[in-house]
Amino acid sequence: MVFRFDHTRGLGLMTNDDLSLCEVTAHEVLPTDHDWLLSNGFCEDYRGFWTQGRSTRIDISKYKESKTARRLSKRCVITFGDNVIDDDVIRVYESYCKHKGFDRMIPIDAYSSCNQLRIYVDGILRSVTFMSDVSENMVSYQFISDYERADLSLGSVSQMMECLFARQHGAQYLYIGFGYEESCLYKTRIHGLEWWTGSVWSSDMSKLISLMNGDSMLPNCYQITGYAQN
């Protein structure tokens, strides 16, 4: 395993303030490295790179599902394990990207090796979550939905089922990606959530909420660096 510190994707200050930021990634990673990387705040991205950041995870022993998600799940058919990127998945993915207004689209094939948690409503696929087993833990990489049934809060239903499947598989933690910006505030309401400070896993939700709110006050990376898109 090799760590790389990329200062072409960072920024710094030294005239009136001291600041140095750069991207930290792990390469040449072996399967035996995955547990260490996850437990030390790294997340694997669609390129197969492991990036250090403000990771989040759920302690499955402390997780409690909500009554609302449980009730709404009874109106759905939920399957787990199919890893075929078929036309239905592509349709949901394209609808998801359009709904979110993303400037970029992560290649759907990046998730071809993942298990899928699928949610059907009235026989139609409405959402997919891409997940993987990593030793004694599970990782949830991406949730997508066509948002045609917003009344069913499929994101909440999926999150509940992810945790229940993780519990059934004997997982200690479910890793759920980074925790940046106000779009991730919902994570702070999950029972058992922990976040990576850079040195330890913390349960201080007040601090995490403050950090997320601060993230959303920053200019985007293109405005900050001018070359971060490369």
Regions found by a protein language model. Name each.
Residues 47-62, 176-230:
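Active-site/acyl-donor-binding loops of N-acyltransferases
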Residues 44, 48, 61-62, 69-151, ...:
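A conserved beta-strand-loop-helix scaffold within acyl/acetyltransferase catalytic domains
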Residues 37, 93, 187:
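Conserved active-site tyrosine of GNAT-family acetyltransferases
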Residues 2-6, 16-28, 32-34, 113, ...:
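Acyl-donor binding region in acyl/amide transferases
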Residues 40-41, 96, 100, 190-194, ...:
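Alpha-helix boundary/capping residues
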Residues 36, 87-90, 195:
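Generic detection of intrinsically disordered/low-complexity segments and helix-coil linkers/edges
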Residues 1-77:
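Acyl-donor-binding surface of acyltransferase catalytic domains
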